[in-house]
Amino acid sequence: MAFVLSLLMALVLVSYGPGGSLGCYLSQRLMLDARENLKLLEPMNRLSPHSCLQDRKDFGLPQEMVEGDQLQKDQAFPVLYEMLQQTFNLFHTEHSSAAWDTTLLEQLCTGLQQQLEDLDTCRGQVMGEEDSELGNMDPIVTVKKYFQGIYDYLQEKGYSDCAWEIVRVEMMRALTVSTTLQKRLTKMGGDLNSP
């Protein structure tokens, strides 16, 4: 019994210590999930993107905000979380269910949900009481406007197959940017609790 208690105490100390692996660290698993989600989007196309060129639109992906030095470390995590949450919301709708192969769509939504759950472990620790303030943070507002533009576009186009194909390609870009942001966070130290 004493051995088990000692083992549990050691695990707790390691988990919350500066080198703890159970703290808010961006894991390899998160990066693997991101790559897998990108791979799932590729075969979801029903049409050739070339057949939908007339429906192309620049949605204003905030790529320069994410890839440049505009985001501070304390802003990067909420932006990453918001991008993944909005991507999940987009593909977890009745309209998207009608547009895509159900199996691939379910796998994509499961992968996005897994990424969000992994990040959610850190979210409370990183965002804490500031959560309500972060909803009004300029980068978050920019991400929300970006996705609102996508929703508006789909509605304007009547959720057509070409509109969904354009959005699929755009979401591949968005997930690539999210992956870049995850890499930046890892380079910033990976520990989302450190200043």
UniProtKB/Swiss-Prot annotation:
Entry comment describing in which tissues the protein is expressed: Constitutively and exclusively expressed in the mononuclear cells of the extraembryonic trophectoderm.
Subcellular locations according to the entry: Secreted
Any Pfam family matching the protein: Interferon
GO BP: defense response to virus; female pregnancy
Intrachain disulfide bonds: 24-122, 52-162
Key word DNA-binding present: no
CDD domains found in the cross-reference section: IFab
Cellular compartments per GO CC: extracellular space
Top-level taxon: Eukaryota
GO molecular function: cytokine activity; cytokine receptor binding; hormone activity
InterPro entries assigned to the protein according to its UniProt record, in alphabetical order: 4_helix_cytokine-like_core, Interferon_alpha/beta/delta
Similarity comment text for this entry: Belongs to the alpha/beta interferon family. IFN-alphaII subfamily.
Record function comment: Paracrine hormone primarily responsible for maternal recognition of pregnancy. Interacts with endometrial receptors, probably type I interferon receptors, and blocks estrogen receptor expression, preventing the estrogen-induced increase in oxytocin receptor expression in the endometrium. This results in the suppression of the pulsatile endometrial release of the luteolytic hormone prostaglandin F2-alpha, hindering the regression of the corpus luteum (luteolysis) and therefore a return to ovarian cyclicity.
Name of this chain's protein: Interferon tau-9
